[in-house]
Amino acid sequence: IGTSKVCCLIARTGRAAPDGTNSAAGQPRIIGAGHQVSRGVRNGTIVDVDATEDAIRKAVYMAEQIAQETISSVTVNLSAGAPQSEILGVDVDIGGQQIDESDLHRIFQQTHTLRETANDPSNGSGSVSERELIHSIPVGFSIDGQQGIADPRGMFGQKLSVNMHLVSASSNAVRTIRAAVDRCHLEIDGFVLSPYAAGLSTLVEDESDLGVTVVDMGGGTTSLSIFYGGEMVFADTIPVGGNHVTSDVARGLSTPIAHAERLKTLY
């Protein structure tokens, strides 16, 4: 749901392609796509819920017609809500036992507890209710001080540590997007931060392992994400995009917006 357009993609996994070949297990294959000129969104933020709802409905309908499928739930890209990144380190005692799924669940739960405590209004550090957690990504495990562990399950140790990359966004902005999508009779399965999605869709494994910065300039926002060690370690979005360049060209040359957009695109 962007400033310049609203897009809907319908994907299928693990099914035969039109040429008779089978897609790789878990590999999504686009079977429908729809897009509409965005109305009611400015600099990535919804300013008119009715207009945004109409654009979402039309984009989804177009994708459904192409895919010949009817969808009831969606995953929504999020670029609004002033996303914030923070790295939080957490330790748990293992007692020399073998690490399993329950230990990972325990350390992730402790991460969320520490975040809520740090943002408790009684501590004078703001209110956690003002921001909604979008992503909680482990960016590095260590066991008894040994770093660089990708997956600690099955290993033994006394202390398990993890650095968690937490990405949050304004609760009000998220609720507004939910309201617009709900009015289209669609259930939201989850949110994906736009710069995170941009990195996942464009980077190869070597790039994300060695370290890379992804910059995605949209119509009303520009997003940035940094990947290292195969994971996103930082993300941010600013409310400035290609439309601002178009407006500057139009003002500088005293030409209509449509002409300025063409000049920007060509040159």
Protein language model annotation of sequence segments:
Residues 1-213, 231-233, 256-267:
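Nucleotide/phosphate-binding catalytic cleft detector across ATP-hydrolyzing
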